[in-house]
């Protein structure tokens, strides 16, 4: 069930005074959900806070930049934690395998795989993993407890000096609550034998506050094979002073194991061998854990962030069945174990330049990935019988950036920035020929313009260079670990260049809309083929598109939101008709209606449209579009709240994802090219009971 509604209480006042009070509270760093009435004799009313209603005119650096949070999350039914990011306009989160695996993400014509060009930070700690056993930029959000997320700040495009690796399509920063207005215990039961329990509370300490949250989820899911999910999450956050220094410390712990069904071949369903929710290999699944500690410290004019994380993943997969080995099958295990350390230093300031007022931003970042196990094994019934590759890798990155914003006039802001990233790495492989070390660096200019056309309207133009890193093994590999053939070393830092123009309109009375046109070109999109343990480059690409995003607060209780995006992507240098980027969905749309009543009723109705996509470069094979509708309603009375969610309300038989490739089923004499798809969940009903204290 969607979390309970978030609200603040205070004496009645005009809408203008409410907006001013909220703006002052946010600017002062006061938690808007904790502002309480000071006049106990006044009549109390609720004010619902929507992150998308926060006024960004005069402060945002681009039209596509935004904030989501507060009631944006608490009124939204979520099928999976990755759908938190579907509040970012144009973003889609799907799944092509089990629930313990990172989601598949789509944005701006990118199939982001598991996060390759969209970076995420949780309390200052990077979520994406470099040189990962399954996918470069692997972004697993399963360690996050949705009820504790206060807000997400997002940016799109490579226009910002403080965003680096994996940020070509965009970046996001997630912040958890410092304190809760009330503690709660929440129990959810649902279809597929699902049980989920969340407990959270906060309390004051001598010099600050301490928040804790615990989550347990188990489910067998809605597929033909029981998923047997067992997930445990914990969070402990301290906000206050340490040795007189304003600080935040966040400790998270995540552990999960699961069984999964992978995408299945269309021919097996058409022949009646399996149904849409069936499976070919019953041994797929995995286990993972992540234990992290991050901290933020205010050191005078400087802000310091530091983090450390211990991570493990074992993933059993088999997308091709018996294509490569008719006797043992093609099942394999990917294993990743690492330690991650890093931090950043940031300073904001102000200065005069040729009589112009200016704001400055300077910073530095360091990150070290110590990947101790980076392995690929052939398996049979989950048991290893052959090693394809066993590697370890150490990857160090250093970054520095500077950005200045000049107030050319009362209406015009100009921003210039420069960023440099340096990466050094060392790889030790099972095959000595694939061992080695190297380094690379990249300089990235950034530019921005914002012009206030009117009190309620602002124009933006942005341009910048960015990059994504690739699996460092690609730079030193000399021998294909499967075929034994010679391979060519690849670049580690792949540059991209992008620009956008757009408008932001906000009438300051509950209605805002943004319109953006963008283009993004990359030099290459190096793809790591996890089941073969190899890496290969694609041709250069170009994507362009438009995005529309609108939010309207009809009154204090009822809001509507709508977003739509269209993106076209092609490989550069290839002839027309043979240059489509596969699995790059052109059209995406979402709409929602949310109501938070005065009598304890909260309701939400949401629609998500995911357009069709080419599965081959010549568009001869296409994935069909999909439309899903989710709904939720809850009723709060005293300290209690009960509710129900319906996910995929109309039980649409759509697909989450589809691919086109060769596979061979047991009993087939040769390989067959086919669509392999993973269906969306059928209708799921969840009931929730919450007690607040």
Can you name each region flagged by the protein language model?
Residues 4, 560, 612-614, 634-693:
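C-terminal beta-signal and adjacent terminal beta-strands/loops
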Residues 184, 189-218, 223-261, 284-296, ...:
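Transmembrane beta-barrel wall of Gram-negative outer-membrane proteins
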Residues 241, 245-254, 286-430, 450-452, ...:
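Face-selective signature of the C-terminal outer-membrane beta-barrel domain
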Residues 126-156, 174-175:
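Short acidic/polar hinge/loop motifs at secondary-structure boundaries
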Residues 347-350, 409-410, 414, 422, ...:
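Gram-negative outer-membrane beta-barrel transporters
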Residues 82, 86-129:
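Extracytoplasmic beta-strand/coil segments of soluble accessory domains associated
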Residues 199, 296-299, 303-319, 452, ...:
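Membrane-embedded beta-barrel scaffold of Gram-negative outer-membrane proteins
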Residues 153-161, 170-203, 214, 221-222, ...:
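Short strand-turn segments of transmembrane beta-barrel domains in outer membranes
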């Amino acid at each position: 069930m969607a979390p309970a509604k978030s609200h603040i209480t205070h004496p009645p006042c005009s809408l203008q005074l409410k907006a001013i009070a909220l703006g002052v509270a946010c600017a002062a760093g006061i938690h808007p959900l904790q502002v309480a009435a000071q006049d106990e004799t006044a009549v109390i009313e609720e004010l619902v806070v929507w992150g998308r209603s926060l006024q960004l005119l005069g402060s945002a650096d681009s039209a596509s930049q935004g904030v989501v949070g507060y009631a944006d999350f608490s009124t939204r039914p979520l099928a999976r934690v990755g759908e938190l990011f579907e509040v970012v306009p144009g973003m889609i989160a799907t799944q092509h395998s089990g629930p313990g695996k990172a989601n598949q993400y789509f944005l701006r014509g990118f199939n982001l795989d598991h996060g390759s060009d969209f970076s995420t930070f949780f309390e200052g700690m990077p979520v994406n993993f470099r040189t990962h056993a399954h996918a470069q930029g692997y972004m697993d959000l399963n360690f996050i407890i949705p009820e504790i997320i206060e807000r997400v700040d997002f940016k799109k495009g490579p226009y910002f000096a403080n965003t680096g690796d994996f940020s070509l399509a965009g970046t996001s920063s997630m912040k958890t609550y410092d304190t809760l207005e009330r503690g709660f215990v929440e129990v959810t039961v649902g279809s597929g034998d699902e049980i989920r329990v969340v407990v959270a509370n906060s309390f004051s300490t001598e010099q600050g506050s301490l928040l804790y949250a615990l989550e347990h989820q188990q489910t067998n899911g809605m597929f033909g094979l029981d998923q047997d999910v067992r997930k445990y999450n914990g969070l402990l956050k301290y906000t206050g002073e340490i040795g007189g220094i304003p600080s935040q410390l966040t400790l998270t712990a995540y552990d999960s194991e699961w069984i999964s069904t992978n995408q299945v071949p269309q021919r097996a369903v058409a022949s009646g061998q399996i149904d849409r929710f069936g499976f070919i290999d019953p041994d797929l699944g995995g286990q993972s854990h992540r234990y992290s500690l991050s901290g933020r410290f205010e050191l005078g004019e400087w802000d310091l962030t530091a983090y450390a994380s211990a991570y493990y993943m074992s993933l059993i997969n088999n997308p091709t069945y018996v294509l490569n080995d008719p006797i043992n099958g093609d099942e394999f295990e990917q294993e990743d174990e690492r330690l991650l350390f890093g931090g950043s230093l940031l300073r904001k300031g102000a200065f005069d330049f040729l009589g112009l007022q200016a704001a400055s931003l300077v910073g530095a970042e360091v990150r070290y990935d110590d990947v101790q196990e980076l392995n690929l094994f052939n398996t049979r019934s989950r048991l290893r019988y052959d090693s394809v590759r066993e590697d370890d890798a150490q990857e160090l990155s250093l970054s520095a950036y500077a950005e200045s914003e000049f107030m050319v006039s009362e209406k015009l802001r100009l921003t210039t920035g420069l960023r440099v990233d340096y990466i050094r790495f060392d790889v030790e492989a099972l095959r000595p020929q694939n061992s080695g070390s190297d380094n690379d660096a990249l300089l990235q200019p950034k530019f921005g313009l914002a012009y206030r056309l009117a009190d309620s309207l602002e124009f933006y133009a942005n341009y910048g260079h960015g990059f994504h890193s690739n699996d460092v093994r690609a730079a030193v590999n000399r021998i294909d670990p499967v075929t034994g053939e010679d391979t060519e070393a690849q670049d580690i830092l792949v540059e991209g260049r992008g620009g956008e123009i757009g408008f932001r309109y906000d009438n300051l009375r509950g209605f805002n809309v943004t319109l953006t046109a963008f283009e993004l070109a990359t030099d290459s999109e190096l793809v790591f083929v996890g089941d073969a343990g190899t890496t290969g480059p694609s041709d250069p690409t170009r994507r362009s598109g438009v995005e529309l995003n609108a939010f309207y607060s009809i009154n204090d209780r009822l809001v509507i939101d709508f977003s739509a995006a269209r993106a076209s992507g092609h490989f550069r240098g290839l002839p027309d008709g043979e240059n489509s980027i596969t699995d790059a969905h052109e059209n995406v749309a979402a709409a929602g209606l949310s109501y938070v009543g005065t009598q304890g009723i909260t309701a939400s109705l949401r629609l998500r449209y995911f357009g069709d996509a080419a599965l081959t470069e010549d568009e001869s094979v296409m994935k069909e579009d999909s439309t899903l509708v989710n709904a939720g309603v809850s009723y709060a009375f005293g300290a209690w709240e009960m509710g129900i969610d319906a996910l995929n309300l109309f039980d649409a038989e759509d697909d989450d994802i589809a691919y086109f490739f060769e596979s061979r089923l047991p009993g087939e004499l040769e390989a067959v090219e086919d669509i392999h798809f993973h269906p969306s969940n059928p209708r799921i009903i969840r009931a929730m009971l919450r007690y607040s204290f």
